Amino acid sequence: MNTLNRAKQLQARTKRFAVRIIKAFARPPKDEATRIAGRQFLRSGTSLAANYRASCRARSTADFISKISVLTEEADETLFWCEVLVESDLIRLKIVEISDVRM
């Protein structure tokens, strides 16, 4: 698979991940803790797709590395909020199946 196909495939996968997160939190949570942590998870998780898309439009190698660095930080934050939500029993792990975002 060439680089362009991989980029398009990863764009589609990160977008699907963002859509799943939006659907998971489409119904307003009943308690404040879930609402706050869920909002953080929603924000960082959906920005993954946007930041990856932006990295595909990089104008130079340095620009690409910079954009991927932001993406890496957002991915780590998304994982953090996912762990917090799951370990606090605020969401079920099934909502966010990590297999959907594996490289």
Sequence positions of predicted segments:
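Amphipathic alpha-helical assembly/interaction segments
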Residues: 1-103
